[in-house]
Amino acid sequence: MRRFSFPLLAYAFAAIMVGTTLPTPMYALYADRMHFAVLTTTVIYATYAGGVLFALLAFGRWSDAVGRRPMLLAGVAAALASALVFLLADSVPLLLIGRVLSGLSAGLFTGTATAAVIEAAPQAWKTRAAAVATVANIGGLGAGPLLAGLLVQYAPQPLLLPFLIHIGLAVLAGIAVFVVPETSARIGRIGLQRLSVPNEVRTVFVIAALAAFAGFAVTGLFTAVAPSFLSNVIGISNHAVAGAIACSIFAASALTQVAANRMAAERAVAVGCGLLIVGMMILTAALCFSSLPTLIAAAVVSGIGQGMSFSRGLAAVVDRAPAQRRAEVSSTYFVVAYVAISLPVIGEGLAAQSLGLRTAGITFAITVAVLAAICLAAILFAEARAKLSAFT
C-alpha cells in the first residue's frame, strides 16, 4: 500500500477541503428559507475561521508527536460531523455549528496533510510534492463551490445532495488515510502552538502579512458575498455561475502558487500586491456596471494576486526566520490570514446594511486596494534603500 500513499493522501486532502467551501452557493437558499440578510451570511461564513484558528493553535503540533494518521482521521471525523449538521440545519445556530466543525476539520487537516503528502512522495516526485499538496488543498477549496453550485442549480434536493456526496467523499478519504502507512517519526511533543515574530524578521513579516491580509480578505469576499453580488447587483440568479465565480479565485490562486514557486519572494509579493490593486479596480467596475464578465475577471486577477503574494510572502518570512522558530512564525502568518478571511467580510455585511450591497462592495474593494498599495510602496521603498546602501 505504500506505493499508493502519495495519491491517496492527496485525494484525502482535496476531498476534505471540498467540504469547507461547499455551502457557498447555498447561502442564498438558507437566507430565503430562514429569512436572514447578508450580514448573517457573512457571520455564518466567518465562523469557519474560528474553528480553523482553534485547531491550528490547540493541535498544530500534535501530528509530530502522535503521528499524521490520528490527526487526519480526527479531521475526517470533524468533516463528517459538519456535513451531518448541515443536513439537519433548520436554523442559524445549526449553520454556525456546521461552519465551526468545518473549520476544525480544515485546521486539523491542512498542516498535517501537507506534511503527510510531502513525506509520502516517491523519490521521483519529491521536488513536486509541495506543489501537489498545494493543488490538493486549494483545488479542493475551489471544487467545493463549483460542485455545490451545479448540484443546487440542476439536481434535486439542493440543500441535501451536496452534503450527502461530501459524506461519501469524506468516508473514502478516511479509508485512504487509514490504509496508508504512517509517515511521521513521532518525535515532537504535544502542546499549544506558540506564536511569535522575532525582531530580525519583523519588517519582512509585517509587509508580507499585510499583503496576505489583503489577499485573504478578497478570498473571503468572493467566497461569502459573490453569490449576493451576482443575484442582487448583477441580477443573475444562477447558483452554478455563483459557484464557478467562487471556484475561479481558488483555481487562479492554486495555479499561481505552483507557477510562481521559483520567483524571487520580494518581487513576487510586489507583483501580487499590484495584481490585487488591479483586481479591486476591476471589481469596482463590475459592481458599478453590473457586469458578469468583469466580475469573473476580478475573481481571476485577484486570485492570481492572492496566490502570488501569499505563497511567496510566506517563503520570504520563513527563509529569514531562525530555524528553531520557523513553526512559530509561519503559524503567526496563518493566524493573520485566517483573521483576514473572516473579520473584513463581516465588515462588508455590516456596511451592506446601511450602504447597500453595491456601495459596500465598492468600499471594500477600495480599502483592499489601498492596503495592497501600502504594501507595494513599502516593498519598493525597501528595495530602493537596499540599492542605495549597496551603492554607497
What are these regions (language model features)?
Residues 93-102, 293-301:
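Paired small-residue
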Residues 242-265, 279:
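Transmembrane alpha-helices of Major Facilitator/SLC transporters
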Residues 306, 314-365:
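A late C-terminal transmembrane helix in Major Facilitator Superfamily
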Residues 98-136:
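Cytoplasmic helix-loop-helix junction between adjacent transmembrane helices
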Residues 35, 67, 88-93, 156, ...:
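Helix-breaking motifs and short loop linkers at transmembrane-helix boundaries and internal kinks
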Residues 268-311:
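C-terminal transmembrane helical hairpin of 12-TM major facilitator-type secondary transporters
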Residues 53-93:
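Conserved MFS/SLC helix-loop-helix module at the cytosolic interface between two early adjacent transmembrane helices
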Residues 124, 128-178:
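Helix-loop-helix hairpin linking two adjacent transmembrane segments in secondary transporters
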